[in-house]
């Protein structure tokens, strides 16, 4: 894979899990990484690790649901690196509750972080990419729950399904400008969110019964898929949805 030297990518939810692994991997390929999250100590820790390894990173605190935070991230990113080449809309919020147990504020939180945050990332990321006029790549992190339903996932399915189609709409609209928009749909992954999903279940039994490859994904495997989509290796891909679930949705 060609390196990403002199390119700059914004990665939301970059303080832990998939976002942290993607930040480290993309930086290791020569890119400037702007990683954002709400938890400052997590973001600074990832930034420090990247810098200590001799790569380029800048942490900016951000709530992806706040429009002014997006303006600030773009402004600081352009001031620091001079250009933006892509955005990875990874920040997420999840609620594993039945409809009866869900409150409206629970539903809104999941929709706001996952769907509204992704919309704002698409909107402001596109504006920044346009400034250099050479196209770019926006990656939406959806979920297998953006493609199929499951019990106690009402808000998550609604939000992640919206992210999936937001990516397709963005691909249609932005293709003429060589701005590509694709979505990734992870299955069960070794993150805090993944652990919460299987809480109360026999995880080993769930995995063996539902995932043909017989294990969960690790965050690094999802990060490699993100790297592929932000790189020129995927230059003719837009509007695509890459499912990385070990065969969970193949049954």
Please identify what each model-predicted range represents.
Residues 127, 172-176, 235:
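Alpha-helical segment proximal to the catalytic Tyr-Lys
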Residues 15-17, 39:
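Conserved glycine-rich cofactor-binding loop
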Residues 143:
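Residue(s) in the substrate-gating loop at a strand-loop-helix junction
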Residues 122, 159, 167:
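Active-site helix of classical SDR
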Residues 88, 175, 180, 237-239:
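Short, small/polar-rich loop/turn modules that mediate ligand/substrate recognition or access, typified
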């Amino acid at each position: 894979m060609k390196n990403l030297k002199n390119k700059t990518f914004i990665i939301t939810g970059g303080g832990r899990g998939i976002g942290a692994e993607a930040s480290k991997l993309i930086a290791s390929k020569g890119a400037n990484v702007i990683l954002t999250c709400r938890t400052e100590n997590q973001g600074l820790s990832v930034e420090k690790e990247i810098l200590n390894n001799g790569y380029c990173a800048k942490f900016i605190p951000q709530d992806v649901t706040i429009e002014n935070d997006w303006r600030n991230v773009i402004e600081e990113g352009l001031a620091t690196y001079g250009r933006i080449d892509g955005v990875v809309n990874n920040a997420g919020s999840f609620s594993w509750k039945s409809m009866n147990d869900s409150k409206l504020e629970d539903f809104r939180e999941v929709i706001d972080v996952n769907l509204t945050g992704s919309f704002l990332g698409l909107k402001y990321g596109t504006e920044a990419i346009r400034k250099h006029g050479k196209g770019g790549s926006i990656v939406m992190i959806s979920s297998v729950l953006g493609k199929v339903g499951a019990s106690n996932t009402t808000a998550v399915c609604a939000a992640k399904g919206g992210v999936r189609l937001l990516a397709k709409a963005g691909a249609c609209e932005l293709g003429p400008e060589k701005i590509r928009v694709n979505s990734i749909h992870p299955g069960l992954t070794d993150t805090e969110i993944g652990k919460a999903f299987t809480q109360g279940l026999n995880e080993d039994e769930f995995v063996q019964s539902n995932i043909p490859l017989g294990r969960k994904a690790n965050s690094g495997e999802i990060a490699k898929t993100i790297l592929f989509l932000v790189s020129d290796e995927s230059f003719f891909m837009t509007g695509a949805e890459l499912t990385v679930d070990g065969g969970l949705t193949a049954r």
